[in-house]
Swiss-Prot record:
It comes from Aspergillus clavatus (strain ATCC 1007 / CBS 513.65 / DSM 816 / NCTC 3887 / NRRL 1 / QM 1276 / 107). This is Probable rhamnogalacturonate lyase A. Glycans are attached at N56, N351. Residues 1-20 form the signal peptide. Pectinolytic enzymes consist of four classes of enzymes: pectin lyase, polygalacturonase, pectin methylesterase and rhamnogalacturonase. Degrades the rhamnogalacturonan I (RG-I) backbone of pectin. Active against linseed rhamnogalacturonan. GO terms for cellular component: extracellular region. Disulfide bonds join C50-C93, C184-C193.
Length: 528
């Protein structure tokens, strides 16, 4: 009995000691941070480079041994310090243009981070990459092995691979920022998730997407891309990026509603607390009610967004003070734009209204939603290369109005693959007057844009769109600047009876197969 009592007392004391382990252990080369959590989290940070060189969670080493976890491709040299303030530990890594923070709260198996920049990193992108052991954490969530490239053969550049007959790429792990609050990698006994609650200093807007994960063999990479040149549509933002949180768990999926308001008390450069922010409330109206509506605010310093409720009402996230462009989308298609000024501590009311305006429709292929939804291969393009054997034949295709399905129309036209796309339609005598053919696109590559021919009339080629200088469709992207082209059709060009329209890719550039000039369709509408 005495032995059992003593054993229980010893275990109780041991447990208290284990929880009391919260703190910093300093050596000449590193800081070891112990979170003091029930499932123990202990990680090591290099004092010279800011690399995380070890992550031990619940008794298992998760960090890839040959290369650390870090900002960008590593800072190289940095001034690194670690301080403890009550229940919080803060690691600060500083260079002349970048300050990276790692924060641990006593008892939580989470590394909270934020990154402040005054200039873009020399590699041309700002990201955090956790390189974790692929034998312990082999799985990628939520999209599975579409981004597992281990054992593959490169088929495009150094980032698209063929693995067991299927195309894979790290780019196929992406999801839209507005929907990406959490992405993870996992194994049989561990899960590590990146929780993203603050995109205000990132670039690209609510529908931008970037790499989330990539199991390349030796390590499984878990990313948070704050900005990059991957189909980037706007300038990079400086200032504080984050907070963002790397959460460690056993089998459970962590929630996405993480409170990081304690950053306000930690002397984080550029952090704006709730008291220094304001909100915008209002009601959106007029757009197609079959689609989700999004309201988006942006200026050169920050960006925010929210879905509206079913009645169009909305409240913005807490925003930094400033004047913002305010945009209203049906799906991803812009239907209205205005401006609003936000002040600290205030709640501004601002309604917004808009709709798609065309004319009397003769035919419409697709919907004005800013996406290639429903078109051929649009259901697969996010997660595989257009050359993949699982793709339906690209054509060239002919779409007959009134008979063909949306899947008979290609999501994209490639100059060297399926050029042109043909549309056949029957017009009445009343429809032979002057008309407009509106061709909506979502993304252009290598200067690709549409040139239309209506029966014997060939419309002028439009000027080249802005060059985003980034592969798109082949890396799972469909959204760029969303150019819309109007073709004025003279009276008498359309005839009573059967008519033929061809839409071709024109560009002064060239390329092979799916890297030839191309564009992605949103919608095609003929109206008077």
């Amino acid at each position: 009995m005495f032995f059992q009592t003593g054993l229980l007392l010893s275990l109780s004391l041991w447990t208290k000691v284990a929880y009391a382990a919260f703190g910093i252990t300093t050596s000449s080369s590193s800081y070891v941070i112990d979170a003091g959590s029930a499932n123990p989290l202990k990680f090591t940070v290099s004092r010279s480079s800011c690399d995380i060189t070890s992550i031990n969670y619940s008794g298992t080493e998760l960090q890839y041994a040959s290369k650390g976890s870090h900002i960008s491709s590593g800072l190289g040299r940095a001034t690194v310090s670690a301080t403890q303030d009550g229940d919080y530990i803060k690691v600060t890594c500083a260079t002349s243009t970048l300050t990276h923070y790692m924060v641990v709260h006593h008892g939580d198996s989470t590394i909270h981070m934020a990154t402040h920049i005054t200039a873009e990193p020399s590699i041309g992108e700002l990201r955090f990459i956790a390189r974790l052991k692929s034998d312990v954490l082999p799985n990628e969530e939520p999209f599975g092995d579409v981004s597992t490239t281990a054992g593959g053969t490169a088929i495009e550049g150094s980032d698209v691979f063929l693995v067991n007959g299927k195309t894979r790429s790290k780019f196929y792990s992406s999801q839209r920022f507005i929907d990406d609050q959490r992405h993870c990698i996992s194994g049989s006994a561990h899960r590590v998730c990146m929780i993203l609650n603050q995109y205000e200093s990132s670039s690209g807007g609510p529908f931008h997407r970037d790499i989330d994960a990539n199991n390349g063999g030796g390590f499984n990479a878990l990313y948070w891309y704050m900005n990059s040149g991957h189909v980037q549509t706007e300038p990079y933002r400086m200032g504080l990026h984050g907070p963002y949180s790397m959460v460690f768990s056993r089998s459970g999926m962590p929630g996405t509603n993480i409170d990081t308001s304690f950053f306000a008390n930690l002397n984080i450069k550029g952090y704006v607390p709730a008291s220094g922010r304001g909100t915008v409330t209002g009601k959106a109206s007029g757009a197609d009610s079959r689609m989700k509506w999004v309201v988006h605010w942006h200026n050169t310093a920050a960006q925010y967004w929210t879905y509206t409720a079913s009645d169009g009402s909305f409240t913005s996230p807490a925003m930094k003070p400033g004047t913002y462009t305010m945009v209203y989308y049906q799906g991803e298609y812009k239907v209205a734009e205005t401006s609003v000024t936000v002040r600290a501590g205030s709640k501004i009311t601002k309604n917004i209204s808009g709709s798609v305006k065309t004319g009397k429709t003769i035919f419409k292929i697709g919907e004005w939603d800013g996406q290639p939804t429903g078109f051929r291969n649009a259901d697969k393009q996010l997660r595989m290369h257009p050359s993949d054997s699982r793709m339906a034949a690209w054509g060239p295709l002919t779409y007959t109005v009134g008979r063909s399905a949306p899947s008979d129309f290609p999501m994209a036209v490639f100059k060297s693959v399926n050029n042109p796309v043909t549309i056949k339609f029957t017009a009445s005598a009343a429809q032979t007057a002057a008309a407009t053919l509106r061709i909506g696109t979502t993304l252009s590559f290598a200067g690709g844009r549409p040139q239309a021919k209506i029966n014997s009339y060939t419309a002028a080629a439009p000027p080249a769109p802005k060059n985003l200088d980034s592969r798109g469709v082949t890396r799972g992207a469909y959204r760029g600047l969303g150019e819309v082209y109007d073709v004025a059709i003279p009276a008498g060009t359309i005839v009573a009876g059967v008519n033929t329209i061809t839409i071709s890719v024109v560009s002064g550039n060239s390329g092979e197969k799916f890297l030839s000039p191309n564009f992605v369709f949103d919608c095609v509408e003929l109206f008077q």
